């Protein structure tokens, strides 16, 4: 779950699920850039921090959000988790960015044999399930769905036949 959408109830449910399924990884994923700002040397494009038993959704959201960095300059120390497959943590960060959320999320890796229980919990709690390949391939898919909305001739010296073309994504894109 993205840190911005996390509630204390959701965090408790995920913590309980990780314990019940003996998940090999339950952590708070942040981007390498955010880790650097928090003075945590990143080892990959995304790192995982241990979630303490007393950590709240607000604590994690505040850690993800840089707007209070100047008022709380001495955060930490942070306990790093051994992250699962870096492709998974990087995909979680990318998914947050695609959703235009802060690049941070609480993640659980399923233990072998517990994947079905995790998927059932996800379905019952309206939690997205996707594949890393779908996340990685999204920019190409999105680019292929662009439609031309207008174009205009822009004669330039030495390139008199130049045109500028504007495209729009199928969902309308972000506001400007």
Language model feature labels by segment:
Residues 1-176:
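Catalytic domains of riboflavin
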């Amino acid at each position: 779950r993205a840190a911005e959408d996390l509630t204390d109830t959701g965090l408790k449910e995920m913590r309980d699920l990780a314990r019940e399924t003996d998940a090999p990884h339950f952590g708070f994923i942040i981007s390498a850039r955010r880790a650097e700002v928090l003075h945590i040397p990143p080892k990959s494009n995304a790192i995982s921090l241990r979630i303490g038993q007393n950590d709240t959704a607000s604590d994690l959201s505040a850690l993800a959000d840089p707007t209070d960095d100047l008022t709380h300059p001495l955060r930490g120390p942070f306990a790093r988790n051994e992250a699962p497959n870096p492709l998974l943590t990087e995909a979680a960060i990318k998914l947050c960015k695609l959703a235009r959320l802060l690049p941070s999320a609480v993640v659980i890796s399923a233990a072998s044999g517990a994947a079905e229980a995790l998927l059932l919990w996800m379905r019952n709690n309206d939690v997205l399930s996707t594949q890393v390949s779908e996340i990685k391939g999204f920019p190409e898919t999105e680019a292929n769905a662009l439609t031309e909305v207008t174009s205009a001739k822009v004669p330039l010296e030495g390139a008199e036949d130049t045109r500028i073309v504007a495209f729009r994504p199928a969902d309308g894109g972000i506001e400007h």
